[in-house]
Amino acid sequence: MTPPLLALEEHYYSTAIFNSIGETFQRTLQGVPGLADQLRSLGDGRLEAMNRGNISLQVVSHAFTPGGPSAEACRAGNDELAAEIAQISDPQRFAAFAVLPVADPTASAAELDRSVSELGFVGALIDNHADGKHFDGHDYDVLWAKACELDVPIYLHPTWPSARMAENFMGSYPVPVGISLGGPGWGWHPDVGLHVLKLFAAGVFDRFPRLKIIVGHMGEMLPYMLERASDMSTRWGGWGPRDRPLRQVWDENIWITTSGSWSLAPLKCILHNTKVERIMYSVDYPFESNERGLEWFKELEGSGLLTEEQLEMVAYRNAEDLLKVHMKKEQ
């Protein structure tokens, strides 16, 4: 019997954040029938979609926020999300990640503190860069320190490339192809993987050995290249010296989700170099459907790759342990 599922890369837009992302990105969302409405809604329609996907608890987060929302917009967006969850007919089916003004690390730390301490959020899901800038500098230590103090994870989530980054994906094909290559078709996934490696190389995990980072989409390319990156990190002077090698940081500081990756092939790779305790189910709703996620999980059940106990770990137990939540096992 398929275990209940806990999904934690599941998206939403508050009015404050939707208004901040710019007309271009609003039009992009509205170009997919029903997508904008699904992102703006936390009502019964979302609960029904969760039921169809056997999801007992959904951790809601704002989707990508290109352009970088202000601290005021993030505060309003988090307040709106908390209020909407409280008004749902079954609020125990939901938890939340905070949206943060990532261009301002000090303001991000303050909003993370407020969202966790006052609103009961279980961490933050943030854009992978702020106008092309990753968060490996010492100016972001204030954010990592706050996450460690609160003992909550930070989910590094792909976002659209900056204008400068986007130029690298244009070529001898129509502009929409370049846009796709720079985004979900390829580019924003390895950019998250690169960010994690930069955090390691910059000593962030040395300064904050209890930092908890989540990456989605089967590890954002990292599992496939982990052995080579680990080897390169120690050669020709290395990326350090570091207190712990990359493989140890991978085992102790990184969690990955299955979001939007409906094939067993990448999971087979992951199981060769990643502890099952660090793998968590997710969908990427509403960009992906809960039903498709359930189909994939049933395929995983029948594959024999995991024991019954391990299936439950991926389905919900690992996320419960990381987020310190306890979902209802029966809907």
Swiss-Prot record:
<keyword id="KW-0456">Lyase</keyword>
<dbReference type="GO" id="GO:0016787">
    <property type="term" value="F:hydrolase activity"/>
</dbReference>
<feature type="binding site">
    <location>
        <position position="157"/>
    </location>
    <ligand>
        <name>Zn(2+)</name>
    </ligand>
</feature>
<dbReference type="GO" id="GO:1900614">
    <property type="term" value="P:F-9775B biosynthetic process"/>
</dbReference>
<dbReference type="InterPro" id="IPR006680">
    <property type="entry name" value="Amidohydro-rel"/>
</dbReference>
<dbReference type="GO" id="GO:0005829">
    <property type="term" value="C:cytosol"/>
</dbReference>
<dbReference type="InterPro" id="IPR032466">
    <property type="entry name" value="Metal_Hydrolase"/>
</dbReference>
<dbReference type="GO" id="GO:0019748">
    <property type="term" value="P:secondary metabolic process"/>
</dbReference>
<keyword id="KW-0862">Zinc</keyword>
<dbReference type="GO" id="GO:1900611">
    <property type="term" value="P:F-9775A biosynthetic process"/>
</dbReference>
<feature type="binding site">
    <location>
        <position position="11"/>
    </location>
    <ligand>
        <name>Zn(2+)</name>
    </ligand>
</feature>
<comment type="pathway">
    <text>Secondary metabolite biosynthesis.</text>
</comment>
<comment type="function">
    <text>Decarboxylase; part of the gene cluster that mediates the biosynthesis of orsellinic acid, as well as of the cathepsin K inhibitors F9775 A and F9775 B. The non-reducing polyketide synthase orsA produces orsellinic acid by condensing acetyl-CoA with 3 malonyl-CoA units. Further modifications by the decarboxylase orsB and the tyrosinase-like protein orsC lead to the production of F9775 A and F9775 B. The functions of orsD and orsE remain unclear since only orsB and orsC are required to convert orsellinic acid into F9775 A and F9775 B.</text>
</comment>
<protein>
    <recommendedName>
        <fullName>Decarboxylase orsB</fullName>
        <ecNumber>4.1.1.-</ecNumber>
    </recommendedName>
</protein>
<dbReference type="GO" id="GO:0046872">
    <property type="term" value="F:metal ion binding"/>
</dbReference>
<dbReference type="GO" id="GO:0005737">
    <property type="term" value="C:cytoplasm"/>
</dbReference>
<dbReference type="GO" id="GO:0016831">
    <property type="term" value="F:carboxy-lyase activity"/>
</dbReference>
<dbReference type="InterPro" id="IPR032465">
    <property type="entry name" value="ACMSD"/>
</dbReference>
<dbReference type="Pfam" id="PF04909">
    <property type="entry name" value="Amidohydro_2"/>
</dbReference>
<keyword id="KW-0479">Metal-binding</keyword>
<keyword id="KW-0210">Decarboxylase</keyword>
<feature type="binding site">
    <location>
        <position position="284"/>
    </location>
    <ligand>
        <name>Zn(2+)</name>
    </ligand>
</feature>
<comment type="similarity">
    <text>Belongs to the metallo-dependent hydrolases superfamily. ACMSD family.</text>
</comment>
